[in-house]
């Protein structure tokens, strides 16, 4: 048969409830109804309704088994008569003895309900007489609400059946039963033991007993309620204990599989409190309250209204409390402690899963205030909400044990405190978290026509704040966490007064828990409907907060995991020591990042709500919170794989050991800030003012600007490893990246395959764009002209920048630092400060530099357009104004007029009628455009070298040692470097700029006066410029030692600009191959180029004339410069210098200085080279232009045609180069030894006590350092101009002839500079005893050697020669001009005569003619005298002199004709020529000895312009043949300088005044010979 489920309507549910109530009342009314059988007791009632039951006769075991059809106890109660004699009952008064007992009182009164009716117990039940155990057995269910038991040693309520066997009570059964034992709010009270036995229990009230045992489920029990067996129910049989219990002992057991026990209330046990079930949940009760209140002023009508309301809701919580001496909650499945408090001596919580968490409470409040009146409105709604977390708290005076037998232990906002030990164990994971509390406030409103500004709009403000209610675990002694899976703590606080042990089979995660704060402000409104402007705002701020986990132990701390240990943004500390270990995973000490995001979106409107300004910004900022692993004693970290420390601290007050089977990485953490910002503004300006006399201007200008800026900034948060002593050991690599290593008392050691100290970058990148768009209009008016002008301008500038600052790794070691790399060792911008010994070793060692840099790039663009229209009528208004003013002036006092006369209107009109110079008004239009763009960039970089500062430095490389500007400094002892090869490069600081610009513009103008004439003018120009600059500054490595400097290299050693300074010791460098000390080089290069051009065109036409003109100009220039400057190395050693090379020893311009001996040794060649610097400059230019014009004019009397033109062309070239060489220096107070197969000293400056030069198989050469200069520059500038005018009268007559007048001219400029120069810096050697042993030749070329005595052997020849210095220099400058005209007005006489006016013109002309005759006579006399002098000095022949006289005669006549007639030919010349040719010895090579000079020369001796001198002794060359050769040279300098004035009249003045003189063009010409000689005393 199928069953059907029916759903009741609300009315049906109400009817069913009433029926149940009536049935219950009826049952109460039946009371206790005995069964009709022989087990039915006698039941009677006494006054007040109390029922008295005379129990049946007990059996041999003292059990009185009573059976009932109904068993219900009302409030008057019931009395079970177990008395053998009469007495007084507490409930029923006087009672007689129970006759059924037969003299034997019952020890157990068993009341069994044999019907199907449940029992309702509302009152007390008393055992009258002898106390006995009480059992009520009703399988149909029992309800107790205010029931209790009197004079019972044990009271048991059993929803089940008694089990009898052979008439004997064996126990009880709740099998196959699902009925309920219900305890109401009025509870249950007894002084004895209490048993509650049922498949299900629902308790809502207070239960008080000596001991309480509650067993649920489907079970069989013994007579004394021991569980014998259980069966799995078909459905869950959950029990609820929502009241309270108070007892000496409380036991709650639910055996039903899949069922649970739920506890809510207060449970107090003097001794044990235990709960056992499949599922256990302790929960607290939440009370809900709400309110809703309207304002007293509320109203609504057609004119307005007020709505005020205050409403809210709240939740309050009554926490569940479990108190007992020993508290045990054991669940087969899930065990949940929710918002409850447990207090006891020892507390044990167990479940397959164990959860201890909290409960959330919500509080809400809303205030509404809405008001309106006609068109005015103002509405505000305020809301407040609070989310509160109520966590669980466990307090154990002794120990607390939390166990998950199958799954996880989860703690959320739990506070657990154990007076002794706290142990948490999980078969899987342990999770320790906090719960987030929130508080939010908001205000939302809108308004219309509010205040005098008539504001209309809406606004909204909200603010949300989150706080963390963290889990807290505290142990008075030890704290232990053990998980077969992972252990994760977030934002938790864990502390033990003694030791902490955290052990996980998988991972240990100590992390942060994050909360968020949020604030939003919006405001959108307008004034006067937008006419008065407006404002928009939408701003938001979001802030993330990281809450660290804190794990601390006053004793020792142990973290152990098979896989990973992850500590993120948290603090771990063991006061008496700490140990962190992974078997196969990583140890990660990491930082946590918190993020703050702020957004701004604002706008302000001006009239008509046009946007006046706006601002948008979004800022995203990260903040790093580093982890801390600290011990006040020893700290050890052991990893089965890698150790990663990121932006965090590991610190030990004692020894710190980090051991890894993989890598050890100590890195900085990055925190990034990103900003995106945009601003706009609109400005409107106007003006109205007088700009000239009676001229006025008015106009406006609008400017809109936009600024967009984005930036990204990356900052590094370094890690630090610190301990009294530090030991880092990795089976693989060790890397420090932008982080620190410190020891406070002792040594530090680092060991790995590869070891690296590298830098990280702090970087900021910006991108900025400024855009301006502007335009305007202006109007000008007044008595002279009217006009208008419109303009538009667009400007944009885009700038990008990047700034990079390196954060190098650093060490600060109080003792010794030992770094051992099985393979390679790398330093990049690292800094080491070691009080003791710095020792490092590896296969390859690199000490490299990094570069801080700043770069910027700017692009700009601008475009402008102007349009103007003007009407100029000043040609009319100004004469009119003057005529009126002249008439007025005639009546003023002081004028020769009749003062009584007044100016009348007729007089003024008469003056105006006489005006004849009025001009036609001019109308014109002008349009101009201009624009341009540029690109500019700049890059600067500064090298940051690795530095090592220690008491003593030992470097040992099995292969390569590589330095880049490294700084070595030993403060106590010496520096020792050992490698197979050693390369030391100089670092470079760089500065670089580039600039490119293109700009141009054009203008067109059109004007007319009559409408039949028109003038058009067009012009344009453009230019492109390119500039570039590049500079580098070199910095070599520095070796500074308080003791010795010892460098031993198996093969080649190369040092670039290096500085060696052994302040109290000796500098020794040994190389098995080449040893090179090369110069470093600074560089400078720049270039500039320019291309420009312009053009113009003008056309004018009238009915009478035509005018045309135009032209163009163009040019280009380019200039470049390259320069290198030598930066040489230095070597000092107070106790001496020793350089030994297994092959070549090369020193390039190096400076050596010592107070003791210096030894330079090479198996092959010792080469002291000079340092070299160069300068190169090149350029060229090319330009030219042409202008031409043509005009024609017709009048009534004549016609004229004119034309003009000009042209100019320039070209030039610059080519210069100089090479400067400078030798090195050797200064020592001890002896100097130079020993090699061959020896070469170039330009060296040597000063020593005694010197020994030895070549084992080659030559010894001491030579000068040669420098050169080269110039090849030239330029030419050519110009031409001409003009011609033809004038033809309408009727050509002798008085009015046709004329043709011209004026032509030109110029030529030429500049030439050519130079080739060679100079020498002689090598110098000053010493006491000089010993020279050369296996082959000895050569001194450009050298000066001075010694007290000279001895030695020369296996070959002795060659001593001086060096010539040469300078060939030619400079030519020519400036020539020429002009010719046939214009009579250009006559010098006519010009002067006409200056006196027509009356004096003839007199002045006659006087000038007479003066000219006297002047020419004087010139002739002067010439005759001068020519005779020149002829005498130069030896000119008579024939030649005659020709010159004839020429000067023609010149004289020409001068006269030019002065008295048309100006004709004019010319000027300025010519300068300089020629220098020097080729001679300026510094003689010499070998000088104060005493004897004794050289055993096997070959010949040759002196070329050189000297051998023995000042106090003899010269002995061992019988060598001597050849002396002189060097011939010369010094030559010549020049010519001619300056002729630009006109013949000026030339005549020169001749008359004697200003022209002729000198010999040769200034110097001499022969300079340098003789070779040998001199002795």
Curated annotation (Swiss-Prot):
For this protein, the record's Pfam families field holds: Fil_haemagg_2 (PF13332), TPS (PF05860)
Region of interest called Disordered, as start-end residue ranges on this chain: 437-467, 1081-1103, 1169-1188, 1213-1232
Write out the biased-composition intervals (Polar residues).
Answer: 454-467, 1081-1095, 1169-1184
Query: Which example biological process does GO assign this protein?
Result: killing of cells of another organism
Signal peptide extent: 1-29
Alphabetically sorted, this entry's keywords are: Cell outer membrane, Cytolysis, Hemolysis, Membrane, Signal, Toxin, Virulence
> What's a Gene Ontology MF term here?
toxin activity
From which domain of life does this come?
Bacteria
Q: Which cell locations does it reside in?
A: Cell outer membrane
Asked if Transferase is a keyword of the record, the answer is: no
Compositional bias segments (type: Basic and acidic residues): 437-446
Question: Where is this protein chiefly located?
Answer: membrane
Q: Which GO terms describe its cellular component?
A: cell outer membrane
Question: Additional info?
Answer: The conserved amphipathic domains in ShlA and HpmA may be responsible for pore formation.
UniProt function note = Bacterial hemolysins are exotoxins that attack blood cell membranes and cause cell rupture by mechanisms not clearly defined.
Name of the protein described by the UniProt record:
Hemolysin
Q: Which organism is it from?
A: Proteus mirabilis
Gene it is expressed from? hpmA
């Amino acid at each position: 048969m199928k069953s059907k489920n029916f759903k009741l309507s609300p009315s049906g549910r109400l009817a069913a409830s009433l029926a149940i109530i009536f049935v219950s009342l009826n049952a109460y009314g039946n009371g206790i109804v005995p069964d009709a059988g022989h087990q039915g007791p006698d039941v009677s009632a006494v006054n007040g309704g109390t029922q008295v039951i005379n129990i049946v006769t007990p059996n041999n075991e003292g059990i009185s088994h009573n059976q009932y059809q109904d068993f219900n106890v009302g409030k008057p109660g019931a009395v079970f008569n177990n008395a053998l004699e009469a007495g007084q009952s507490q409930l029923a008064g006087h009672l007689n003895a129970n006759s059924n007992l037969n003299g034997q009182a019952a020890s157990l009164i068993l009341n069994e309900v044999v019907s199907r009716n449940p029992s309702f117990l509302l009152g007390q039940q008393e055992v009258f007489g002898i106390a006995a155990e009480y059992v009520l057995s009703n399988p149909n269910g029992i309800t107790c609400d205010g029931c209790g038991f009197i004079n019972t040693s044990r009271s048991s309520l059993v929803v089940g059946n008694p089990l009898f066997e052979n008439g004997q009570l064996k126990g009880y059964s709740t099998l196959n039963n699902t009925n309920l034992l219900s305890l109401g709010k009025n509870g249950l009270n007894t002084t004895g033991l209490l048993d509650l036995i049922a498949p299900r229990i629902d308790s809502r009230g207070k239960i008080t007993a000596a001991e309480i045992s509650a067993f649920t489920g489907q079970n069989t029990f013994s007579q004394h309620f021991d569980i014998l067996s259980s069966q799995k129910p078909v459905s869950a049989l959950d029990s609820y204990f929502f009241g309270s219990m108070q007892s000496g002992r409380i036991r709650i057991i639910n055996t039903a599989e899949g069922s649970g026990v739920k506890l809510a209330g207060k449970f107090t046990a003097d001794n044990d409190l235990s709960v056992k079930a499949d599922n256990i949940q302790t929960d607290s009760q939440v009370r809900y309250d709400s309110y809703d209140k309207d304002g007293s002023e509320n109203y609504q009508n057609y004119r307005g209204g007020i709505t005020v309301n205050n409403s809210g809701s709240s939740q309050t919580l009554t926490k569940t409390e479990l108190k007992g001496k020993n508290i045990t909650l054991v669940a087969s499945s899930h065990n949940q402690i929710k918002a409850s408090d447990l207090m006891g001596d020892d507390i044990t919580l167990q479940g397959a899963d164990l959860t201890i968490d909290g409960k959330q409470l919500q509080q809400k409040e809303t205030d509404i205030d809405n008001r309106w009146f006609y068109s005015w409105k103002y509405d505000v709604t305020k809301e407040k909400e609070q989310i509160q977390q109520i966590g669980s708290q466990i307090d154990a005076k002794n120990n607390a044990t939390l166990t998950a037998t199958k799954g996880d232990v989860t703690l959320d906002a739990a506070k657990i405190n154990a007076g002794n030990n706290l142990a948490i164990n999980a078969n899987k994971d342990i999770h320790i978290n906090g719960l987030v509390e929130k508080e939010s406030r908001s205000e939302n409103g809108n308004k219309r026509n509010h205040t005098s500004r008539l504001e209309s709009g809406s606004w909204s403000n909200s603010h949300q704040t989150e706080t963390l209610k963290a889990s807290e675990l505290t142990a008075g002694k030890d704290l232990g966490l053990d998980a077969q899976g992972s252990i994760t703590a977030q934002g938790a606080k864990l502390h033990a007064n003694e030791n902490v042990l955290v052990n996980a089979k998988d991972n240990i995660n100590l992390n942060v828990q994050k909360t968020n704060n949020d604030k939003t402000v919006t405001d959108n409104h307008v004034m006067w409907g937008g006419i008065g402007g407006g404002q928009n705002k939408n701003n938001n701020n979001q802030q993330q907060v990281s809450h660290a986990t804190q794990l601390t132990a006053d004793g020792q701390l142990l973290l152990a995991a098979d896989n990973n240990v992850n500590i993120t943004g948290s603090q771990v500390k063991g006061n008496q020591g700490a140990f962190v270990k992974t078997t196969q995973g990583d140890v990660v000490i990491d930082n946590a990042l918190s993020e703050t995001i702020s957004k701004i979106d604002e706008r302000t409107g001006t009239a008509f709500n046009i946007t006046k300004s706006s601002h948008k910004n979004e800022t995203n900022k990260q903040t790093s919170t580093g982890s801390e692993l600290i011990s006040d004693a020893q700290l050890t970290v052991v990893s089965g794989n890698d150790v990663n420390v990121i932006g965090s601290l590991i610190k030990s007050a004692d020894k710190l050991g980090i051991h890894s089977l993989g890598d050890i990485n100590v890195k900085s953490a990055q925190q990034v800030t990103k900003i995106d910002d945009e601003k706009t503004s609109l400005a409107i300006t106007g003006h109205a003012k007088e700009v000239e006399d009676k001229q006025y201007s008015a106009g406006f200008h609008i400017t809109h600007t936009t600024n967009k800026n984005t930036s990204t900034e990356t900052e590094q948060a370094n890690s630090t490893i610190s301990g009294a002593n530090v030991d880092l050991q990795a089976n693989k690599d060790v890397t420090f990246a932008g982080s620190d290593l410190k020891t406070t008392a002792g040594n530090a050691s680092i060991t790995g395959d590869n070891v690296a100290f590298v830098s990280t970058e702090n970087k900021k990148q910006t991108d900025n764009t400024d855009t301006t768009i502007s335009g305007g209009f202006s109007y000008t008016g007044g008595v002279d002209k009217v006009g208008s002008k419109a303009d538009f301008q667009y400007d944009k500038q885009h700038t990008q920048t990047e700034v990079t600052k390196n954060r190098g790794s650093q060490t600060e070691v109080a003792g010794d630092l030992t770094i051992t790399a099985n393979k390679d060792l790398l330093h990049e911008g690292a800094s080491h400060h070691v009080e003791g010994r710095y020792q490092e070793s590896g296969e390859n060692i690199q000490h490299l530099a990094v570069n801080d840099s700043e770069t910027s790039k700017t692009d700009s663009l601008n475009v402008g357009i102007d349009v103007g229209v003007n009407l100029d009528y000043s040609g009319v208004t100004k004469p009119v104004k003057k005529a009126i003013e002249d008439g007025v002036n005639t009546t003023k006092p002081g004028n020769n007029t009749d003062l009584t006369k007044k100016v009348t209107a007729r007089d003024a009109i008469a003056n105006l009628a006489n005006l004849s110079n009025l001009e036609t008004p001019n109308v014109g239009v002008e349009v101009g455009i201009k624009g341009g763009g540029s690109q500019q960039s700049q890059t600067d970089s500064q090298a940051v070298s690795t530095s090592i500062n220690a008491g003593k430095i030992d470097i040992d490389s099995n292969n390569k040692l590589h330095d880049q500007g490294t700084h070595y400094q030993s403060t106590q002892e010496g520096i020792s470097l050992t490698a197979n090869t050693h390369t030391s490069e100089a670092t470079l600081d760089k500065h670089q700029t580039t600039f490119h610009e293109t700009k141009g513009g054009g203008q067109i103008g059109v004007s007319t006066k009559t409408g039949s004439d028109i003038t058009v003018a067009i012009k344009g120009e453009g230019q492109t410029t390119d500039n570039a600059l590049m500079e580098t500054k070199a910095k070599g490595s520095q070796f500074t030692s308080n003791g010795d400097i010892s460098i031993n290299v198996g093969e080649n050693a190369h040092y670039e600009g290096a500085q060696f300074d052994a302040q109290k010791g000796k500098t020794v460098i040994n190389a098995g191959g080449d040893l090179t000390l090369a110069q470093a080089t600074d560089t400078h290069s720049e270039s500039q180029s320019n291309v420009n051009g312009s053009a113009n065109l003008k056309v004018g036409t009238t009915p009478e004339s035509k005018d045309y003109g135009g032209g163009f100009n163009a040019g280009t220039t380019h200039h470049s410069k390259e320069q290198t400057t030598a930066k040489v190395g230095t070597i000092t050693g107070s106790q001496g210098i020793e350089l030994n090379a297994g092959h070549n020893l090369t020193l390039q311009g190096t400076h050596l200085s010592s107070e003791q001996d210096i030894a330079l040794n090479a198996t092959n060649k010792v080469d002291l080279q000079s340092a070299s610097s160069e300068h190169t400059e090149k350029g060229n230019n090319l330009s030219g232009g042409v202008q031409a014009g043509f005009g024609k004019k017709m009048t009534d009397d004549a016609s004229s045609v004119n034309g003009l033109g000009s042209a100019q062309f320039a070209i030039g070239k610059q080519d210069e180069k100089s090479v400067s060489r400078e030798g090195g220096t050797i200064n020592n107070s001890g002896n100097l030894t130079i020993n090699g197969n061959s020896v070469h000293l170039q330009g060296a400056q040597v000063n020593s006590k005694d010197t020994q030069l030895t070549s084992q198989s080659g030559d010894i050469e001491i030579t000068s350092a040669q420098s050169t200069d080269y110039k090849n520059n030239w330029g030419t500038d050519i110009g031409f101009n001409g003009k011609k005018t033809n004038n033809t009268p309408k009727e050509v007559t002798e008085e009015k002839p046709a004329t043709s007048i011209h004026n032509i001219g030109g110029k030529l400029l030429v500049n030439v500079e050519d130079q080739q120069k060679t100079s020498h810096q002689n090598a110098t050697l000053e010493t006491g005893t000089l010993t020279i042993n050369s296996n082959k030749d000895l050569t001194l070329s450009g050298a000066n050697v001075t010694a007290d005595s000279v001895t030695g052997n020369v296996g070959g020849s002795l060659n001593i020669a001086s060096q010539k210095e040469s300078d060939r220099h030619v400079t030519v400058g020519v400036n020539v001009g020429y002009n010719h005209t046939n214009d009579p007005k250009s006559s010098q006489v006519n010009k002067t005569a006409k200056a006196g006016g027509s009356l004096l013109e003839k007199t002045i002309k006659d006087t000038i003619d007479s003066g000219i005759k006297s002047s020419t006579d004087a010139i002739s006399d002067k010439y005759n005298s001068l020519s005779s002098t020149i002829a005498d000095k130069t030896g000119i022949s008579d024939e030649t002199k005659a020709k010159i006289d004839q020429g000067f005669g023609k010149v004289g006549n020409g001068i006269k004709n030019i002065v008295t007639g048309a100006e004709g030919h004019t010319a000027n010349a300025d010519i300068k020529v300089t020629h220098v040719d020097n080729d001679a010895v300026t510094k003689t090579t010499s070998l000088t000895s104060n005493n004897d000079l004794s050289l055993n020369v096997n070959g010949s001796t040759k002196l070329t312009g050189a000297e051998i001198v023995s000042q106090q002794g003899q010269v002995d060359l061992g019988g060598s043949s001597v050849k002396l050769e002189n060097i011939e040279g010369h010094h030559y300098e010549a020049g010519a300088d001619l300056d002729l004035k630009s006109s013949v009249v000026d030339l005549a003045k020169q001749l008359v005044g004697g200003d022209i003189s002729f000198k010999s063009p040769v200034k110097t010409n001499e022969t300079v010979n340098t003789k070779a000689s040998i001199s002795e005393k």
